[in-house]
């Protein structure tokens, strides 16, 4: 082979090898691209980087490997459903009341484990209903329970425990120091109003979401006191009735509007109609209705209708079937704008529910003492009418058994508030037949349904002879 042929042969071989190297590089690139598109999340992909020499120089093909990590991170944020303030709903329809819970606290106190209480009530949050009571700082039948008939001592405190359970060591929570109280849930947080101190210089502490946020100081210097049952909240504003002044003479009565634990305003209850007002039992039926106790002049009960801004109406329940204790025999006078001036004092805490022109009234069976309990429906009993008639009577505690205070509470359901009430069943002093040194209570509760109820008797049921003295 002559020199020219050798040069031509070397050139052809060089060109052929360069072409092959170029094709290999292109093939690697295509293969790499296809594999990369098929790789899933969170996998390590190895991409070869190809360095191809210039076509005239076919000596080597250099392949360098780089590791690339591909991570797709998804963050899921779970948030609690936003709590809303309670809206102004109507009362649910109802035709009667049905037994709900009974704590049997005195019967269970035979072994001295139960806390001495009085002035119990019930209030509910979004999830549960709770029993509240004013504890005496003593256990049933212990030496410290001697003399617990007293209403106001520095040892009394507001406690909370699950509805239907007795207040025993381990199941209750102390809310505040108090010998008078009211509590309500605004849809987001609990608010408590707690009165304590000297009779002539007491104060009310307002607790919201577990923190002390505001206060009320006694202005009449005569036993500042409040409802002894739940207050009511609409749209975040809670309404509380407060009294200061004599128990059997002209006193001062105020309504406070409180938002998130801070007092927004208060108004004096006009005395044009209401002569005396204390221990109101309030519920929501679009507006707030309060049925209260006249401890001075009336065996008929004073009432108020209130919204988020002002007192809208006041008066006395018209019904000629009165519901305070003591009271005259049925029927009595119709008095819508003033107290009856018959068996006016002292009185007992009670409740009622307006139902159109009708009214449901809870009352002791006895007209003179705190024994028995019944709820009656009085047709046209909310208005001044000659047609008042007892259309329903449910006797829930027989007249042979002790009762006491009673009050309303409401339970939020779909689109309305269910009307409910509790009855305090007092045992011990001052009952002469209860030969013990203490005064305490159990509680029974009922709720309204749009059905016909049955009948029964739900007394305290404890045998005082079995109880610690």
Swiss-Prot record:
What further note is attached to this protein's record? The influenza A genome consist of 8 RNA segments. Genetic variation of hemagglutinin and/or neuraminidase genes results in the emergence of new influenza strains. The mechanism of variation can be the result of point mutations or the result of genetic reassortment between segments of two different strains.
Residues of the region (Head of neuraminidase) are 91-469
Intervals, Intravirion compartment: 1-6
Species of the source: Influenza A virus (strain A/Turkey/Oregon/1971 H7N3)
Instruction: Identify the main location.
Output: virion
Give the transmembrane ranges. Answer: 7-29
Q: Which residues are reported to be glycosylated?
A: 57, 66, 72, 146, 308
One MF term in the entry's GO annotations? exo-alpha-sialidase activity
The record's section on InterPro entries has: Glyco_hydro_34, Sialidase_sf
* Cited SUPFAM superfamilies: Sialidases
Top-level EC class: hydrolase
Region of interest (Involved in apical transport and lipid raft association), residue spans: 11-33
Q: Which residues lie on this side of the membrane: Virion surface?
A: 30-469
What the record says about its domains?
Answer: Intact N-terminus is essential for virion morphogenesis. Possesses two apical sorting signals, one in the ectodomain, which is likely to be a glycan, and the other in the transmembrane domain. The transmembrane domain also plays a role in lipid raft association.
Is the Calcium keyword given for this protein?
A: yes
Q: How is its activity regulated?
A: Inhibited by the neuraminidase inhibitors zanamivir (Relenza) and oseltamivir (Tamiflu). These drugs interfere with the release of progeny virus from infected cells and are effective against all influenza strains. Resistance to neuraminidase inhibitors is quite rare.
Give the UniProt keywords, A-Z.
Answer: Calcium, Disulfide bond, Glycoprotein, Glycosidase, Host cell membrane, Host membrane, Hydrolase, Membrane, Metal-binding, Signal-anchor, Transmembrane, Transmembrane helix, Virion
> EC number(s) for this protein?
3.2.1.18
Q: Which cysteines are joined by disulfide bonds?
A: 92-416, 124-129, 184-231, 233-238, 280-292, 282-290, 318-336, 420-447
Descriptive protein name: Neuraminidase
Which proteins does it associate with, and in what oligomeric form? Homotetramer.
Q: Which residues form the active site?
A: 151 (proton donor/acceptor), 405 (nucleophile)
Task: Spell out the family assignment given in the record's similarity comment.
Answer: Belongs to the glycosyl hydrolase 34 family.
Q: State its role.
A: Catalyzes the removal of terminal sialic acid residues from viral and cellular glycoconjugates. Cleaves off the terminal sialic acids on the glycosylated HA during virus budding to facilitate virus release. Additionally helps virus spread through the circulation by further removing sialic acids from the cell surface. These cleavages prevent self-aggregation and ensure the efficient spread of the progeny virus from cell to cell. Otherwise, infection would be limited to one round of replication.
- Note the topology in the membrane: Single-pass type II membrane protein
GO CC term, one of those recorded: host cell plasma membrane
């Amino acid at each position: 082979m002559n020199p020219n042929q050798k040069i031509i042969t070397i050139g052809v071989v060089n060109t052929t090898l360069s072409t092959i190297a170029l094709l290999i590089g292109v093939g690697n690139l295509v293969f790499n691209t296809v594999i990369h598109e098929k790789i899933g999340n969170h996998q390590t992909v190895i991409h070869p980087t190809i360095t191809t020499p210039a076509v005239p120089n076919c000596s080597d093909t250099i392949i360098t490997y780089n590791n690339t990590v591909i991570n797709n991170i998804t963050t899921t944020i779970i948030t609690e459903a936003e709590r809303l303030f309670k809206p102004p709903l109507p009362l649910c329809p109802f035709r009667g009341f049905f037994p709900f819970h009974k704590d049997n606290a005195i019967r269970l106190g035979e072994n001295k484990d139960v806390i001495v209480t009085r002035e119990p009530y019930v209030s509910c949050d979004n999830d549960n209903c709770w029993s509240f009571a004013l504890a005496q700082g003593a256990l049933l039948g212990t030496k410290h329970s001697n003399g617990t008939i007293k209403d106001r001592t520095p040892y009394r405190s507001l406690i909370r425990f699950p509805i239907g359970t007795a207040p025993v060591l381990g199941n209750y929570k102390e809310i505040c120091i108090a010998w008078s109280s009211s509590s309500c849930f605004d849809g987001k947080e609990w608010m408590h109003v707690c009165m304590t101190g000297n009779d002539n210089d007491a104060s009310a502490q307002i607790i919201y979401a577990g923190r002390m946020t505001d206060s009320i100081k006694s202005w009449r210097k005569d036993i500042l006191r409040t409802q002894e049952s739940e207050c009511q909240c609409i749209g975040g504003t809670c309404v509380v009735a407060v009294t200061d002044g004599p128990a059997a003479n002209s006193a001062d009565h105020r309504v406070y509007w409180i938002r998130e634990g801070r007092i927004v305003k208060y108004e004096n209850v006009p005395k044009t109609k209401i002569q005396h007002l204390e221990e109101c039992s309030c519920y929501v039926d679009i507006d707030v209705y309060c049925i209260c106790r006249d401890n001075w002049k009336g065996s008929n009960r004073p009432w108020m209708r209130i919204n988020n801004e002002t007192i809208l109406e006041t008066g006395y329940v018209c019904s000629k079937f009165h519901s305070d204790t003591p009271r005259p025999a049925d029927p009595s006078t119709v008095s819508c704008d003033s107290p009856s001036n018959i068996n006016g004092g002292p009185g007992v805490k009670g409740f009622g529910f307006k139902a159109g022109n009708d009214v449901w009234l809870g009352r002791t069976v006895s007209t003179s003492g705190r024994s028995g309990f019944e709820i009656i429906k009085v047709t046209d009993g909310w208005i001044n009418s000659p047609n008042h008639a007892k259309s329903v009577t449910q006797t829930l505690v027989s007249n042979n058994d002790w009762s006491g205070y009673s009050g309303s509470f409401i339970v939020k359901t779909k689109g309305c508030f269910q009307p409910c009430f509790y009855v305090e069943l007092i045992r011990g002093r001052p009952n002469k037949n209860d030969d013990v040194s203490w005064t305490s209570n159990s509680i029974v509760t009922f709720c309204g349904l749009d059905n016909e109820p049955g009948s029964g008797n739900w007394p305290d049921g404890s045998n005082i002879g079995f109880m610690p003295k």
